[in-house]
């Protein structure tokens, strides 16, 4: 059985930054550090940080006065931000800068009184945070997930209308929704390119190349990870058996028993140690040496807040 590795895969710059913010805060200030929502959607990462003293909460009211609070990589609404400001808290923002870019687009539209349409998945924390940047009662903020949603959407003024997208969507699905928006609302304005982030796009491109060669595709990522789900869906659309797994223990021998080639990739919030464990398990099941495919090189780095720019080793 051949093992192929998608490239790129795993951590993106936004996830690296968010995890570093929590790790550095723990090193500098000590436990406990409060984090609103899972800092990234990966069970292994969250459990590891919890063991070191991070406390994950959903409501600001759960945080005691005087505590350190970190916003997750998915971002928060202005209402949540304002609630935190009103409390005696030290706040660090781990929102991915590419999500912040979308927040700024929505805030600008709100100030101008333009109605805005967000393409995204209802209930996802990034969507809730982005929708929560709009506050102009004269305008409106709407959420659509599919071309059918676009057909049933009513707006107040088609002449002052813009759209944005969640950063972790399917590139293909989003293109279909954008086409539907432009057909329904010819004057709609959008970003020069959609807001889907470089890492999401690159990993979908990589899994497409992987699925062209593999019989079975394993995507390392948690069930609540939007970008990981999109990777598994893309491989399935290409007619391949694809499975989303948290770690190597999820692998069922029957999945790969007849496979000549198994492809492995990882969502943007999945650490490489999980991928290495998956490779080891596949080798136990008869796999050979893991062969990485060629792919786009990623050199993007997002800095942590200056207050947290320390060598963690110096404070341990």
From Swiss-Prot:
The keyword Transcription regulation does not apply. Dimethylallyl diphosphate binds at residues 41, 74, 124, 225-227, 269. It catalyses: isopentenyl diphosphate + 2 oxidized [2Fe-2S]-[ferredoxin] + H2O = (2E)-4-hydroxy-3-methylbut-2-enyl diphosphate + 2 reduced [2Fe-2S]-[ferredoxin] + 2 H(+); dimethylallyl diphosphate + 2 oxidized [2Fe-2S]-[ferredoxin] + H2O = (2E)-4-hydroxy-3-methylbut-2-enyl diphosphate + 2 reduced [2Fe-2S]-[ferredoxin] + 2 H(+). GO terms for molecular function: 4 iron, 4 sulfur cluster binding; 4-hydroxy-3-methylbut-2-enyl diphosphate reductase activity; metal ion binding. Its EC number is 1.17.7.4. Binds 1 [4Fe-4S] cluster per subunit. Keywords: 4Fe-4S, Iron, Iron-sulfur, Isoprene biosynthesis, Metal-binding, Oxidoreductase. Isopentenyl diphosphate binds at residues 41, 74, 124, 225-227, 269. Gene3D superfamilies: 3.40.50.11270, 4-hydroxy-3-methylbut-2-enyl diphosphate reductase, catalytic domain. Its cofactor is [4Fe-4S] cluster. Pfam families: LYTB (PF02401). [4Fe-4S] cluster binds at residues 12, 96, 197. The active site is at 126 (proton donor). GO terms for biological process: dimethylallyl diphosphate biosynthetic process; isopentenyl diphosphate biosynthetic process, methylerythritol 4-phosphate pathway; terpenoid biosynthetic process. (2E)-4-hydroxy-3-methylbut-2-enyl diphosphate binds at residues 41, 74, 124, 167, 225-227, 269. Pathway: Isoprenoid biosynthesis; dimethylallyl diphosphate biosynthesis; dimethylallyl diphosphate from (2E)-4-hydroxy-3-methylbutenyl diphosphate: step 1/1; Isoprenoid biosynthesis; isopentenyl diphosphate biosynthesis via DXP pathway; isopentenyl diphosphate from 1-deoxy-D-xylulose 5-phosphate: step 6/6. It is an enzyme of class 1 (oxidoreductase). HAMAP family: IspH. Homodimer. Belongs to the IspH family. This is 4-hydroxy-3-methylbut-2-enyl diphosphate reductase.
